[in-house]
Regions:
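Conserved small-residue
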Residues: 1-187, 204-208, 229, 237, ...
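Elongated scaffolding segments in large macromolecular assemblies
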Residues: 7-10, 220, 224-227, 231, ...
């Protein structure tokens, strides 16, 4: 049967968690990894792999987090030079902007040296999932300028939505924290969180559900299990960015295409067991956007829907991107998805 993940089809967190968990299992060396929604009135996300029951899946997640919680991992690396002085993670795509050419060169040198280290260290693995996430997150855009100056944040993945208040960044203040939390759990606690038997939100120290940001924008603020959030944030790896000289980098699933603050995320709903590669191909396709947005061209929408159906999709999900009114550190989060069956 496989692991049935906690969460509704109308929550982007559930799709991201399925994609992230599938990637983690492939990085563990699992064979025939599959994921998809059940064909039911209330669909559930199911992830399977040959020889992996719920406990084995949880062990893989635990080992994955433990390896990245250790000192010296890429998640543990900070930018050492000014203006960061060890207070920003090396691979966070949104950090304090460099103020000079030497600072930009320092940032690029540190990033490239560590990427080279990752490539050399992972040559024998079947799949280097770390580089997949690093690449998908994007990077500070040294090439982007506008009338009012540099725009380094335009090189970042739009689904990396950690608020930047108090100088916080995605990896140092979220991914690194979750790695340690999941590493400190045992397999049974990880299973419980992933399948929804319990919701343990160790990353949030308060008592009000509507103030927890553990989901990091993939849902509206609410209590979120840390293991589920860990998998979901690795799901960002399935949403690559394409950098552009003359505009903000394009992130898969973001609508309008190329807008710095998109209005919507569009996801496909694949029913049945599909490979991660199939999911990723559909996620980045123009057809998934056309099916959800081609109001002016019925022919284009029909063609897109036919293509999606041929690739396993039954519907699309459209999520509104909510943005707070804080001008200094605007908070983005995804609302509930609008499910639309393919015509």
């Amino acid at each position: 049967m496989g692991m049935i993940l906690s969460g509704e089809v109308t929550s982007a967190l559930t799709t991201f968690a399925g994609l992230g968990l599938a990637l983690i299992l492939e990085g563990d060396g699992a064979e025939r990894v599959r994921l998809g929604w059940t064909d039911a009135a209330e669909p559930q996300m199911v992830v399977t792999a040959d020889g992996y029951d719920d406990e084995a899946i949880a062990v893989a997640v635990h080992e994955h987090a433990t390896a990245r919680a250790v000192s010296g991992s890429w998640i543990d690396c900070n930018l050492q030079a000014a203006p960061w002085n060890g207070n920003s993670a090396l691979f966070s795509p949104r950090v304090k902007a460099p103020q000079s050419l030497p600072q930009w060169r320092s940032l690029q040198t540190e990033r490239l040296q560590r990427i080279d280290h990752e490539v050399e260290d992972k040559e024998q693995l079947k799949r280097d999932i770390d580089l997949e996430l690093i690449g998908a997150l994007g990077e500070p855009a040294y090439w982007r300028f506008a009338n009012n100056g540099p725009r380094p944040d335009e090189g970042a993945n739009r689904w990396e939505m950690k608020t930047r208040n108090r100088g916080e960044d995605f990896i140092r203040n979220r991914l690194r924290q979750l790695a340690q939390i999941v590493a400190d759990r045992d397999a049974s606690a990880i299973v419980s969180g992933l399948i929804g038997q319990s919701v343990k939100d160790e990353a949030y120290k308060g008592k009000r559900s509507d103030e927890s940001r553990t989901a990091t924008g993939l849902t509206s603020p609410r209590f979120t299990d840390s293991a589920l959030a860990w998998c979901a944030l690795w799901g960002i790896s399935s949403f690559p960015v394409i950098h552009r000289l003359m505009g903000a980098s394009v992130t898969a699933g973001a609508v309008p295409i190329g807008k710095f603050t998109p209005m919507h995320l569009v996801l496909p709903v694949l029913v049945g067991a599909h490979t991660l590669g199939r999911w990723q191909a559909v996620v980045v396709s123009e057809q998934v956007i056309q099916a959800a947005t081609s109001r002016e061209s019925a022919a284009a929408a029909r063609s897109a829907c036919a293509w999606l159906a041929a690739h396993g999709a039954r519907a699309t999900l459209t999520f509104h991107v909510n943005v707070s009114d804080n001008p200094n550190a605007p908070e983005r989060s995804l609302g509930a998805g609008r499910l639309e069956a393919l015509n």
